[in-house]
Amino acid sequence: MKINILNKLARFFLIFGFLLAYNANAEIGGDFTLKDYNNNKYNLYSSSKEKIIFFGFLNCPDICPATLSEVSNLLKKLRGLSKRIDPIFITVDPERDKPDLMKNYLSFFDERIIGLTGSQDQIEKVANQYHVYYSYQDKGKKDNYTV
């Protein structure tokens, strides 16, 4: 039994190590400037705080609210340490996720979560920097489309 577990662990770390080495040169992230839900410019590198960055959209039925709840719980568990963190929510649906709606929505989870938006091109550029993929279905149906 112990040997079986050790075998599985060895395989896991071998595969994990390979994936890390394979992706070692892949650059993910980088600086950006978007607008927050108060219409102020937010530059990622303007603060020395650690960042938790989450891409999502307000009409997301399950994964986005569940993840925002996890971020909120993490901030509560960190207590005073949470002052050293900027939790950031970047919308991938800037047409529908207007700043006032985003501010109201995020306040249900935690007032410290910073909601960011921009033009469709700006959001796409930042998403590409972070290797985030999203798409729209039925975009021609005004506000009745899926992300």
Q: Which residues fall in each region the model found?
A:
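Short, internal strand/loop/helix patches
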Residues: 103-147
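N-terminal "domain-start" segment that seeds a small globular fold
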Residues: 23-46, 69-70
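Bacterial N-terminal signal peptides that target proteins for export
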Residues: 2-13
